[in-house]
Amino acid sequence: VTRVKDYAFGQVTTEAIRASKNDAGSLVDGLKEEVDGAIYTCMRSLAIAMFKNSGGARGQISAGSNVGTPTITLANVSDIVNFEVGMILNVSATDGTSGAKRAGTVTITALDRDAGTLTASGNWTAGIAAAAAGDFIFQNGDFEATKSMISGLGAWIPTTAPTGGDSFFGLDRSSDTTRLAGVRYSAGSGGPIEEILIDTAARLVREGSKPSHAFLNPLDYANFVKALGSKVIYDRASPVDEPSIGFEAVKLMGP
């Protein structure tokens, strides 16, 4: 496994340093704020990368977006949580696991977290001439010749089973995709989320696994809790001053 390095920057202006000449405490406060901000930025970057494939893409421009304007819409609206105002972006036709980024950058000046739109300081094609609908979006510096993003769950357990010629840290996992690249379970036509989780657990146990945790995004977890809530009978024999709704945690009893 190859280690990678991800960075965040903090800065204190010369003006701030000079202004605190007679008050060392104020300089310390300024430094602490910058360092805390950089640490938080690193934590956010790591949290995003933990579930990604090491390519570094934070989202994708929707097929219907017009890159000749300042505003584009994300293909997955929920990816809006990966962006912030002031962030400098690159784009590429690939997801970062291959290929190269397009020349140029754009800077986010506004975003709509409900509509899933990113607005740049100018037309996207003004900052990145070759930008196109369907391109993947990266924070500037995340898609370089030297990798800076960790290999998250999307890399260790890829959505598509590895095929011949695969090289994951030098290992061709196509010889036994389940043992070397995890289990991919398709729910087919769908169904209640609790049933899908139980079926997934059954498949994992069949392969000799001992699953201990299931990770859901907030929206899926909310739907899961609501589905379970409709099947719970609340004992009203004793009055409760502060009734509780929902669950602090959900323990799934699999095979």
Where are these regions (language model features)?
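Core alpha/beta structural scaffold of self-assembling particle/tube/pore-forming proteins
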Residues: V1-P255
